[in-house]
A protein has these predicted regions:
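Beta-strand-rich solenoid/repeat architectures in extracellular/passenger domains
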Residues: 1-13, 25-39, 51-63, 75, ...
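Glycine-rich beta-solenoid repeat tracts in large extracellular/virion proteins
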Residues: 16-23, 41-46, 65-72, 87-97, ...
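Short polybasic linear motifs
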Residues: 52, 93, 101, 122-124, ...
Length: 224
C-alpha cells in the first residue's frame, strides 16, 4: 500500500489518521501532523518493511502518538520539526527489529513525552537535527533492545530531569558529535543499562547544576 498525504493530518478523539495492515507499506506525509489526545495515532502500520516519510512539522500532545509501526525493518524519516508535549505522548514508536529512525528536523520533547521510542534489536536512530528535552519523564530517544545505535549529530539539550538518550540492552553504541548541554538534578544526557556499551563523545559537553552527563549501568563499557 502507498498513501500520499499532502494536506494537514489532524487526529483527535482516539482516532487514527492513516491505518495500514500489510508488509512493505509506504506513507508520504507532506502536510504536517497534529495528534491531540490519548489513544489517537497519526499514522499506524502493522507489517514489516514499512517506510514513513514525515516532511511536515509534527505536534503530538496529551498522550497521543505521531507514527507507530509494529513490524520489523521499519524506516521512519522525520524531515520536519517535531514537538512532543505531555506524559505518554510519543513522536515515533516502533515495535520490531532492525528499525531505522532518521530525525533530520529539530525535536522538542516536553513534560514527560518521548521523541523516538524503539522496542526491538538492531535499532538505529540518526538524530541530525537538534534535540531539546525538558521535564521529568521526558526522553529524546529511548531504545529497548540489543545492538542499538544512536548517532547524535545535532545538539542535545537536556534539562528539568529529562533524559536525552536512554538505552536498555547490550552492545549499544552512541556517537555524540553534536555536543551536549545538561542542566538540573536528575537530568541525564546519555543513559545506558546493559553490557558492552560504547559511547563516543566528540562534541563539546556542558554540565551544570548537579546533572550527570552520562550514566552507564554495565559490567563492560568503553568511553572515548
Amino acid at each position: 500500500a502507498v498513501v500520499n498525504q499532502d494536506g494537514e493530518l489532524d487526529v483527535s478523539g482516539g482516532g487514527h489518521g492513516i491505518d495500514i495492515t500489510g508488509d512493505s507499506a509506504t506513507v508520504d506525509n507532506k502536510g504536517g501532523m497534529t495528534v491531540a489526545d490519548a489513544d489517537s495515532i497519526g499514522i499506524q502500520i502493522d507489517g514489516d518493511k514499512a517506510v514513513v516519510n514525515n516532511d511536515g512539522d509534527n505536534a503530538i500532545s496529551n498522550g497521543g502518538t505521531g507514527t507507530q509501526v509494529n513490524g520489523d525493518e521499519a524506516t521512519v524519516n522525520n524531515n520536519g520539526n517535531t514537538t512532543v508535549d505531555g506524559k505518554d505522548s510519543t513522536g515515533t514508536e516502533i515495535n520490531g527489529d532492525k528499525a531505522i529512525v532518521n530525525n533530520d528536523g529539530d525535536s522538542t520533547i516536553l513534560d514527560g513525552g518521548t521523541g523516538t521510542r524503539i522496542t526491538g534489536d538492531d535499532a538505529t536512530a540518526n538524530n541530525s537535527g537538534n534535540t531539546t528535552v525538558d521535564g521529568q519523564g521526558s526522553t529524546g530517544t529511548e531504545i529497548a533492545g540489543n545492538n542499538a545505535v544512536v548517532n547524535q549529530d545535532g545538539e542535545l539539550d537536556v534539562s528539568g530531569g529529562g533524559h536525552g538518550i536512554d538505552i536498555t540492552g547490550d552492545s549499544a553504541t552512541v556517537d555524540n558529535k553534536g555536543g551536549m548541554t545538561v542542566t538540573d538534578p536528575d537530568s541525564i544526557g546519555i543513559q545506558i543499562d546493559g553490557d558492552k556499551a560504547v559511547v563516543n563523545n566528540d562534541g563539546d559537553n556542558a554540565i551544570s547544576n548537579g546533572a550527570p552527563a552520562r550514566r552507564l549501568t554495565a559490567t563492560k563499557h568503553r568511553e572515548q
